[in-house]
Amino acid sequence: MLNNTKKIKEIYEEIQKKIFYAVPGRWDELYLYASIIDRLGKVQTGEMYFYFMPKGILKRKFINVYEVPFKYDIEEEEYMKLVDLLYDELKLLRDEFAKTGQKIWSNITISIKNNRFKVEYNYDNLLGGQDEYYDHHIFWRNKYLHIEPHSRKEKNAIEQYIANRRPSRKKDEEYDSGIYQKRQTNIITYETTDFKETQKVEYLATKQEKSKIKNQILCNK
């Protein structure tokens, strides 16, 4: 059973904040996947990606986080700093699980839809190889986004993932709550310079010319 302490709930709020600032424009739903795998020598590896559905009435499709700089004309390097900060927050969540004596999860799926914030914790034994990453990505995309495999390779990937999965004895667990804050929309450009990872990071959206909004990271020592 999950022990969602006050600190963990505060981290949930920070995760939401970083997600909202990393997704430009208006959107209806979002799904995020992240894995964190411990290696020897305190080395960690893993991956993170998310997809969101833009709001609109015309035919739509999910947009991948790594497509954002090109689709929204955002400077890629600066945008990826925001994405890295989001992944760092997920690492803090995992560290807090360890501090509270809970079993450490290997991967999570976060969904935001209909003003609900859901976190699904999974404890599978992950190896972190490129084949595993690819197979799981195709499987996950099919499960959560309902994107059907378009090629024999993708169909094989789903079959391979199911066949090679190394489930933990611990069952998946879930946290479900309302969102903590209103979404920030129409974020156009990003400024993430002059900050250090060791500093406390806060976000501030400020209006600029032509009603543009600039996303700044403010650093407090």
Where does each model-flagged region fall?
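Acidic, proline/glycine-rich low-complexity IDRs
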Residues: N114-K221
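A short glycine-rich, hydrophobically flanked beta-strand micro-motif that places a catalytic Asp/Glu
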Residues: L30-S35, I104-S111
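A general structural signal for short secondary-structure junctions and capping/turn motifs
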Residues: A22-V23, T100-G101, T109-S111
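Short, solvent-exposed secondary-structure capping/transition elements
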Residues: D28, F62, A98-W105, V119-N122, ...
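A broadly used, surface-exposed interaction patch
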Residues: K55-L92
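N-terminal "first-domain core" detector
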Residues: M1-F70
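Short linear interaction motifs
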Residues: Y12-E14, D84-G101, N220
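Alpha-helix boundary/N-cap detector
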Residues: N3-E10, E14, E77, K81-D88, ...
